[in-house]
Amino acid sequence: MWDQRLVRLALLQQLRAVYGIKVKGGRGQCDRRRHETAATEIKGKVFGVPFNSLPHSVVPEFGHIPSFLVDACASLKEHIHTEGLFRKSGSVVRLKALKSKLDQGEACLSSALPCDVAGLLKQFFRELPEPVLPADLHEALFKAQQLGAEERNKATLLLSCLMANPTVDILRYFFNFLKSVSLRASENKMDSSNLAVIFAPNLLQTSEGHEKMSANTEKKLRLQAAVVQTFIDCASDIGRVPDFILEKIPAMLGIDGLCTTPSLEGFEGDFETPGECKRKRRQSVGDFVNGALNKLKSSRTPSITPQQDRTAQASASPLILTPSVKRKLPGESSHAFSSKKRKSIKHNLNFELLPSHFFSSNSTPVSVHLDTSPDGSSQTSLSPIAMSGNHLVSTELRRSKRIASKKVYRVESGKAGCFSPKVSRKEKTRRSLRLKFSLGKNRDSDGCSVINRYENVGRRLANQQNLKSRIDSVKTGLLFSPDIDERLLKKGSEKISKSEEHLLTPDQLDGTGYRMSWTEPSNSSFQDMSANGTSPIMQNLEVKSFSLEPDITVEKSPVVSCELRPSTFHSQPDSSVLSLSGDEGNLASETLQKIQKAFSESGSDLHMVINHEQSSVTNTGEEVEFRDVTVTESKGHDGSCAGEEENCPSERNFSPDQSPEFAREADEECYSTQMKVECEGLHSETPKADPLILQAFPGEEPAEEPQSPRNQLSTPSRGNENGGESAGASGAPGEDESTCSVAVLSKPRPQRLSRQQSLVEKCDSVAPGALQVTEHGKVSDHIQWFNKLSLNEPNRGKVKSPLKFQRTPVRQSVRRINSLLEYGRQPVRQKLAIFGDAASPLVKSVSCDSALPSCVQNTSKGPTAPLITSGLEAQKSTSCNKSSVELTSKSFTKMKRHPDPLSASLGTPRLCKQENKSNGHIKFPLDDLTNHERLKFVVNNNVAFSPGMKNRVVRKPSEKERVWYKGSPKNPIGKTQLLPTSKPVDL
C-alpha cells in the first residue's frame, strides 16, 4: 500500500478542502515517541506508564493490546449487564489495594468487584503520561463535532486515521468494548452518551477538573463527550482510511492509474533515530512536493518509463522552445532539491502549462513544406523572437544545462538566443528550419497585435552582448549554413535565401507577403526560369541592368527571396549548382571572386562597403545616408543598356528624407538595419533594395483602404510591370516593357510603399543626377531617441548624472504669485494701451501641452497686429524672419529669446532687475523649474531700433502697484490680494 505519510498528506488535504479543518502538525508524535523511548526503562509498573513499556497481548482482530486492558475488558464482559457500570464508583481502599497488587505483577482482577475493575480502568487511562487521543488533534476533533451528523462522523474518522498505528489499535479495541456495553443499555442503563460523559475526561485528560464551572468549561466538556460518543458509535471504522482517499493519491502525485506503486526507498529508515524525527519529517514533505512536481512536469508519464526511452523521445523531435516531455532526473537527486531548484521547476512548469499551440510537439509539426501554398504555409509556427523578445535570452543559462545532457549537437544559427539542432542533411526534418526563420509572417492574420514587435526591437537590441561578433558570425556562417545547401539541392536553382539577413528584424510586410509579384499560385515558374540558363529575358539582362531583383526583395517576405544571376553566370554548366551545395569553402571562394569581379565591373569600391558595414552602431545617420534605396530601371530595349551602364539614367538614389513621414518611421527602426549583413554581396550584381522598406513597415494599414493619389499615380506603371514580368516569365522574346520602379503588389499595397514608388517615378523626371536631400537634425534626433533603447551604445558612459531636485525658494514663489496677481489686477484699458507698445513680461501659455508663450508679437506684422496668436505660428514667423533654424525640442517648453524689440522690453524695474540677474530667462508665473535644465538663451543685440521705441516700450509702475507688493516672508500677502479660483484672469 501507499506510504503512511502519503496517506497523511491526502487526509490533511481532504480535511482542509472539504471540512475546513486544519491540523497543527507534526511535533506531537515525535514528542510522544521520545517520551515512549524514555519510559522503556520503567519495568513492572502498570499505571502511569506509556503503552510501549507495558506487556502486550495479541488480540486476533486488533493486534497488540496492553495485557492489563485485555484482562480488564474480559473481566467486565462477564458483568456487562450490571446496572450503572462505570457510573458507580468502587471503594477507594479497595482500588488502592488492587493497584498495588497489579504494579507488583499479581493477577487479581478475576476476583475483584466489577465496579472496582471499572474504576481501575478509568484510572489507568487517566494516569497515562499522554492522553490516548493525541493532544494535537483535540482542536480538530472539537471542530469536527460542530458539523452535521453525517459530516461529523466522517471528519472524526478521518482524524482518527492521523494517529499512530499502536494508538489506533488500542482505541479500536477499547471503543468496540464500550460499544458492546452500550448495546446492553436496556439492562445496564449505560448508553453511548452516558459512557461518553464518563470517559471523556479520562481519555482527553483535561487539566481543568478543579476549576469552577463556567459556560466555556461546560461547552468544552460537551464537545469532549461528543468526540467520545462518535468514536463509540463508529468504533469498527476507527483508523481505517477510506477508499476514496487512497484513490486520490495517484492523481495528487500525477501518476497514471496503471502505474505500479512508486518506489519509496528514501522513506524507509526515517523512524529509526527519533532524535532526527523533525528534520526527516520536513525532508519527506519536500520529497512529496518535488515528486508531484516531477510527475506533473513529465506530462503524466508512468514512473516506470526508462530514462533512455524518455531522452530518446525528447531528442527525436527537436523543438524551438522547451519540449513538453522532460527528461527524468536521476534517482539519487530526485529527493533533495534546494529551494532555488524548486522555484525553477515551478517556473518551467507554469511555462509549459500555457495553452499555446506552438509549445506542444503534438500540434506543431516538425517538418512543414513552406512552398506548397504561398498564403498559409507557416500559420502555426511563429518565431520565438516574435513571441517574446527576451525570454529565450533570460532562460538560456538554465536551459543550456539540460541541452548539454541531451546529446543533441547544436550549431549556432545566428539567431538571437536560439540554436538549431544539427541534423544530418539526408533527413527531411531539415526543412523545419524554414519555419524558425519565417519572420515574414504577419501575426495580424491570427488576430494578434503587431505593436509588440516594435517593443521587441529595443529589447532584443539590449540583449545583444556583442554586436560586431554577431555581425561577423552572420557574415561567415549564415548564407553557407546547411539550410541553404538543402534548399539548393532541393530546388536545383541558384536562389539564395535572404531569410538569414533578416533574422534580427521583426517587422515584415503584411500577411500575403509570401506571394510572388505575379499572380501564380506558387513560385515554381520563376524557379524554372532562374534555373534555365537559356531563358530569353535572362540573356538580355547584363550586369546591373536588370530590375527584377529589387522588385522582389521589396515586395515579398524576406524568407522566399529569389535572386537572379547575370547571364554570364547562367551560361555556366549546372555543376555550379553542385558546387554551391557542396563544400562551403569552395562556395565562399567562388562567391568572393564573383563579388570582386562585379564590383570591379561596376566601378565601385568593395572595401568601402565592407568597412562601412563594420562601422559602429552610433553611425546610424551615415548608415541611412549610405543605404539609400537604389532602384534600377532597365529602360533600354532588350540589351541596349549593357554597354552604357554609366550613362543611362538607370539608377536613382533617394534618401528616406524625401518623404519625411517615411524617414520619421524608418529611422526608428534603423538599429535593426545594422544587423543587415554584408552577405548582400552575394547579390552583388544587383543593386540592393533598401532594407528599411523591408523592415520598417509591418503592414499596419488595412488592405481594403482606397488608393491614395500616390497609389493612383503609380497604377499605370504597376500594370506595365505586371505585363512585363508575366511576359518575361513565359519567355516572350519580344518583351521590352521592363520598366519597373520598386515593387509590384498583387494586392493594394500599404500607403507608405506607394509613396516610395511615386517618389521614385518623380525622380526619373527630375534630373539624371542622383538626388540626395538629408535633414541631419531629424535623423540625429531619432537616432538619439533610439539609442536610449540600447544598453550597449558606446555613449553609455556619457549619460548625464541624475537631476538634482532643487526646491524653488519661497521668496521666488511669492514673487511669481504676486506678479501674476498684480498683472491680473491691471485695468483693461491700461493693458490694451500697453499691447500696442510693449509685450507684457508675464506670458500666459496657450496650452498645457506646448507651454508656448502667447503674447509674443511678430515684428513683421507691425504694432497693430493682434497679440494673442498661437505660440507656434509666432515662433515660425520669427524664425523665418531672422533666418534662424536653431529650433530644438526644448524650445517648445522655454522659448528662445530671438532679437525682438517688443519681447526685449520688460515691464517694471523690479522685474527688469530680476531678468538681468537670471541671464535672460523669461520668468513665467508659477513656472516649475525643478526638472528642467537651465538653458543659456541666445540674445542678439545687433538689431537696431529707434530710441523713441525704447522710450515707448519701458513702462513705469504706478504708486498703487508699488504699494500692493507685500510678497516677502516678513510681509506676507494680504487677504485682499488673493483672487478666488472661479474668477478668470484677464489677459
Swiss-Prot record:
Which parts of the chain are coiled coil?
none
Residues modified to Phosphoserine: 284, 315, 317, 338-339, 481, 581, 655, 819, 840
The record, for SMART domains, names: RhoGAP
Q: Which GO terms describe its cellular component?
A: nucleus
Q: Where is this region: Disordered?
A: 297-341, 632-669, 700-756, 960-987
Is Transmembrane tagged as a keyword?
Answer: no
Q: Which residue positions hold the site described Arginine finger?
A: 87
Q: Which UniProt keywords apply?
A: GTPase activation, Nucleus, Phosphoprotein
Q: Does the keyword Nucleus apply?
A: yes
- Enumerate the GO terms in the molecular function aspect: GTPase activator activity
Q: Name the InterPro entries for this protein.
A: ARHGAP11A/B, Rho_GTPase_activation_prot, RhoGAP_dom
Q: Which residues carry this modification: Phosphothreonine?
A: 305, 322, 505
What gene codes for this chain? Arhgap11a
| Rho-GAP domain segment(s) | 52-239
State the protein's name: Rho GTPase-activating protein 11A
Alphabetical GO biological process terms: positive regulation of GTPase activity; signal transduction
Q: Where in the cell is it found?
A: Nucleus
Origin superkingdom: Eukaryota
Main location, first listed in the record: nucleus
